[in-house]
From Swiss-Prot:
Gene3D superfamilies: ABC transporter involved in vitamin B12 uptake, BtuC. CDD domains: TM_ABC_iron-siderophores_like (cd06550). GO terms for molecular function: transmembrane transporter activity. This is Petrobactin import system permease protein YclO. The gene is yclO. The complex is composed of two ATP-binding proteins (YclP), two transmembrane proteins (YclN and YclO) and a solute-binding protein (YclQ). The chain crosses the membrane at residues 7-27, 40-60, 76-96, 100-120, 128-148, 172-192, 223-243, 262-282, 288-308.
Amino acid sequence: MRNQMKIALLVGLAIVCIGLFLFYDLGNWDYTLPRRIKKVAAIVLTGGAIAFSTMIFQTITNNRILTPSILGLDSLYMLIQTGIIFLFGSANMVIMNKNINFIISVLLMILFSLVLYQIMFKGEGRNIFFLLLIGIVFGTLFSSLSSFMQMLIDPNEFQVVQDKMFASFNNINTDLLWLAFIIFLLTGVYVWRFTKFFDVLSLGREHAVNLGIDYDKVVKQMLIVVAILVSVSTALVGPIMFLGLLVVNLAREFLKTYKHSYLIAGSVFISIIALVGGQFVVEKVFTFSTTLSVIINFAGGIYFIYLLLKENKSW
């Protein structure tokens, strides 16, 4: 099957999943349909942002088992949210305004990515693996600081923080939908012209430089893009650890191509199918007895172990 046909198949499955979610057991159209449309839009945006950012990140790191969470961006997001509550309280209407909070989170995550990038290329012989090591250290630091502040704040305000700690597709922040959509659209348009570079970047730094790619500049720009996309997805539903790893590697296995124009589209549609279809199953089959994030992390964790064992055998 050609890759165009495979992408068309994924698009068809995504449309079927969205149609089922929107129209199955609808009941009162006027009340239910607008809410389901908002929910589906947020899920699609989240799935697209996670898949897009993970594919870009794996390309610039040239590693199939890494996700942007290794940079500590998820931990930084939680530190920002905890710090805001700790310093200003949950009653501060300006800081707790969802749009202002979202913009602050995005800007701080971009700033952190730039600082990491400067550390990465400050000395000779530093490479992407040094960046990942620093990211792990900072991620641990941010998690520890968040836990420390959570121990000190008022229990009622801790409840506000706790709502942001876990991914929830039943309590999606739809107020940010238009802002997130505009950011995602602009980011996608900006990144699309780099897709021809991604095919070369996936060969590694030395090959990319030899073939005329301004490696440092492109990596710096893509790290900013990853920070933006991660902040969009995290602000909408909360942190999800393994979704990107799962859908990107499934896209690679399904499409079996090096062309990122196909891989990005495939991973985005697989992510949409997984999230919308998974949420439909959680609501209609499991009747909310479990959550989609638990299923994703469980399946993603098993697949991560499989990838490690598979790569170990290839070594």
